[in-house]
């Protein structure tokens, strides 16, 4: 199993370009099922989760090619198998996203109950209840979801809880349904807006994404499109914190700062100097002046749960005490035990992490437990004294494109160790 070796102490400096957003790309890849015409993606990140979605689509009969411009072209005109098998789904919970598209276009889907991140309960009930309201018949058989419908019919759906993938799945199902669908209590994440933009570029009629209510007027068919994946706000936030914990000065290009206000506001409170110009964000930080900032995660526009672990590291190096509260997922403090081995002073009680800032961290062998926990351990290693070995880095490859290359370019001493 590959590992990352980090020798801490180098201040990061320089400029990097932000990769395309995984959380925007995955539902769009699932939505290619909705059209029999080819779709071309630009700025698609090279990540393990993207590869997994390619494997799922490929197993159904999709044709996926890469052109000379490094753009991916996907054609789902010859799908012959409407099943997402367990051996693929178990590695990525977002596999459930193909459910809505398959039922809408082909009237049937057989999807293994999802696996993926080990960070608590992420129920698929919201997806299934909403699909039933659109007219689908749902059965659970031997660990699989079987959904079928002769034709989906638009209706009003009030989600019983906010779910990003639930919102996205039903958006995809509703674009080919008869009549109008109104979704309420929906996720407002920028990636939901991105999916709406993508679907509309294919000829769908989706309005209201990013607000409390999404309205979808069903159409008979969708056409092909060429679409560029927006920048990954979580990747950008992670690199900004990498600069902050090392007392560095970096610029991230190809990123929309307006999508990151919830992150940037907290970084400013921690003492970071941030300058925004068009699609660039520059961060400068004095490592000796990190201020503690309380964090409470919430659905967008609140502070993103996917940045909680990274900000925990920043708080752990602050001049004071802070509290990080996780309101979105249970069991998402598994990184704390490993961080404490490096010298952090963090106590977890329920959904709260109580943090007392320390002057420095020490390198140590640590083990990653999930994607964002992996990122937090790398951040800790960058600013720690001595050598840190991060094990089980397959987690990091699910969501960060060439992370060791980008960090090395900024001046980090980081090396990928082979199996």
What are these regions (language model features)?
Residues 1-419:
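Short, structured segments at the rim of ligand-binding sites
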């Amino acid at each position: 199993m590959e590992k990352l070796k980090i020798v801490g102490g180098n201040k990061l400096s320089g400029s990097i370009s932000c990769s395309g957003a995984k959380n925007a790309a995955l539902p769009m890849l699932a939505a290619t099922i909705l059209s029999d015409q080819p779709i071309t993606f630009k700025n698609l990140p090279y990540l393990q989760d993207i590869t997994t979605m390619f494997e799922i689509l490929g197993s159904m009969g999709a044709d996926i090619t890469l052109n000379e411009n490094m753009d991916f072209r996907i054609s789902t005109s010859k799908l012959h198998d409407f099943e997402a098998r367990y051996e693929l789904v178990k590695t990525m919970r977002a596999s459930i996203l193909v459910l809505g598209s398959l039922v809408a276009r082909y009237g049937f889907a057989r999807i293994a109950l999802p696996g993926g991140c080990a960070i608590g309960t992420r129920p698929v009930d919201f997806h299934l209840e909403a699909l039933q309201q659109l007219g689908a018949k749902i059965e659970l058989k031997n660990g699989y979801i079987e959904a079928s419908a002769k034709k989906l019919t638009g209706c009003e759906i009030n989600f019983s809880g906010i779910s990003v993938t639930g919102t996205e799945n039903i958006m995809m199902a509703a674009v080919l349904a008869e009549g109008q669908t109104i979704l309420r209590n929906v996720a407002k994440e920028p990636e939901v807006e991105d999916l709406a933009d993508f679907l509309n570029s294919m000829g769908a009629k989706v309005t209201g994404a990013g607000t409390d209510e999404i309205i979808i007027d069903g159409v008979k068919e969708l056409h092909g499109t060429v679409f560029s994946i927006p920048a990954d706000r979580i990747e950008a936030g992670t690199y900004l914190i990498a600069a902050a914990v090392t007392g560095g000065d970096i610029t991230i290009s190809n990123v929309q700062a307006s999508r990151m206000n919830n992150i940037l506001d907290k970084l400013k409170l921690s003492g970071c100097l941030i300058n925004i110009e068009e699609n660039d964000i520059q961060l400068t930080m004095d490592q000796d002046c990190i201020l503690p900032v309380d964090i409470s995660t919430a659905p967008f526009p609140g502070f993103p749960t996917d940045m909680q672990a990274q900000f925990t590291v920043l708080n752990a190096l602050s001049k004071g005490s802070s509290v990080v509260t996780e309101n979105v997922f249970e069991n998402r403090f598994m990184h704390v035990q490993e961080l404490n081995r490096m010298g952090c002073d963090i106590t977890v009680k329920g959904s709260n992490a109580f943090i007392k800032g320390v002057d420095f961290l020490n390198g140590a062998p640590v083990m990653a437990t999930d994607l964002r926990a992996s990122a937090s351990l790398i951040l800790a290693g960058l600013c720690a004294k001595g050598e840190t070995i991060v094990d089980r880095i397959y987690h990091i490859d699910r969501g960060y494109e060439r992370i060791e290359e980008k960090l090395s370019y900024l001046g980090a001493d980081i090396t990928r160790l082979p199996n």
